[in-house]
Amino acid sequence: MISFNQDIATALDRAIVKITDKFLEPPIMITISNSDSVIGTLGNFSASTGKAKSRKTFNVISLVAAALSGKQILQYKVKVPINRPLVLYCDTEQSRFHCHRLISRVYKLINYPTTEVHENLKFISLREYPTKERISIIEYALSKYAGKI
């Protein structure tokens, strides 16, 4: 987030990407098995968007399960750095009841006991909050768990 004291012109100059720039490819985190498709790299923020009832949640839950288990779940393989094992899941649409059901599905996919809280999953249900509060809560969570997610 750019602070109001920062020179915006300098920030703009630094933000421009040129064809002559050279960058190292970030470590690959999420792939689809049996293909060369990379769908996530270390340091990137991902959101799942699409039409209603298009199986977005099903795919995301599969990714979460793969990240927590270190195993392929459905077609997804996720490599999580040992020092950054935390999965932060922010749901803005579903009730706490339905979010709880999603956590149960993740636990079932990874054969994790539902009598224990998985230390590497922080599942946040935000539907009850206004948009500005959701943003603030997500920003706080990102800063609180920085270096672990």
Label each PLM-derived region with a short phrase.
Residues 6-18, 47-56, 86-93, 121-134:
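Short charge-dense sequence patches
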Residues 81-149:
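Conserved inter-motif catalytic segment of the P-loop NTP-binding fold
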Residues 26-27, 32-36, 74-77, 136-140:
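A generic local structural motif
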Residues 2-35:
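N-terminal pre-Walker A segment at the start of P-loop NTPase domains
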